[in-house]
A protein has these predicted regions:
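Single-residue recognition of alpha-helix boundary sites
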Residues: 13-14, 135
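Sec-dependent N-terminal signal peptides
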Residues: 4-13
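Sec/Tat signal peptide C-region and signal peptidase I cleavage site
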Residues: 15-19
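Conserved positions within compact, well-structured domain cores
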Residues: 21-223
Length: 223
């Protein structure tokens, strides 16, 4: 009987340790991440850039900008000169601006990297598609904030608040849905890709780059 009790205690301690490793990992700056058990090994942050808790909306960023601001519009966007056909970076079409054929954000233009450090980045399209297709999405509420609970293959869950996006005015219907920037753009349109969710669930979509949207960092640890 004593041996059985000892085995049970050891097992419970091991499970507790495993749970802590899944849910409570953090870097030296206390930026926390969660292991959802995804095939790629991608680890997702537990909160948005600029947030103080998982349900906090955090800051809003135009694509390729690293600081929040009050107005999100073509006239305030860093990588154009005030019009759709005046792109100065991340452009593959001469009719849209200066061609450089860049389709992935440089680290200096990555809001996750600049605000959280070099081990963090904005997710790629592949990482977002993996989150969409490999996880279970469920509309939920955390501390009164609407959003989605995303449960990975290993049963671990993270929360994405429905923060919508910002433009040149106040946000209407906040809590209805969300849009999270990726690090990638097709280059041939004045929009970039990201993860969107709402009443219809989660999907990959494009949005004008100058819009202010949420950023959820990712990292991949060496195995």
């Amino acid at each position: 009987m004593k041996n059985l009790v000892l085995i049970m205690l050891v097992t419970m301690m091991a499970l507790s340790t495993e749970a802590n490793l899944i849910e409570n990992r953090s870097d030296s700056n206390d930026h926390r991440w969660i292991d959802l058990g995804l095939p790629s090994g991608t680890l997702w942050a537990t909160m948005n850039v600029g947030a103080s808790s998982p349900e906090d909306y955090g800051d809003y960023f135009a694509w390729g900008e690293t600081s929040p601001k009050e107005v999100y519009s073509l006239s305030t966007y860093k990588w154009c000169k005030g019009a759709e056909n005046t792109q100065t970076k991340y452009c593959s079409d001469s009719e849209l601006g200066i061609v450089d054929n860049k389709k992935t954000l440089d680290p200096d233009d990555d809001a996750a990297t600049i605000n959280w450090g070099p081990s963090w980045s904005m997710p790629t399209e592949a990482q977002m598609q993996e989150l969409i297709t490999r996880c279970n999405w469920k509309a939920s509420t955390m501390k009164g904030v609407k959003g989605y609970s995303v449960t990975g293959p290993n049963g671990a869950t993270m929360f994405l608040p429905a923060a919508l996006c910002r433009g040149d005015g106040p946000i209407d219907d906040i809590g209805w849905g969300g849009f999270y920037w990726s690090s990638e753009s097709p280059g041939f349109i004045d929009a970039s890709g990201g993860l969107t969710f709402g009443e219809a669930g989660a999907s990959w979509a494009f949005l004008y780059r100058f819009g202010g949207c949420s950023v959820r960092p990712v990292r991949v640890l060496n195995k």
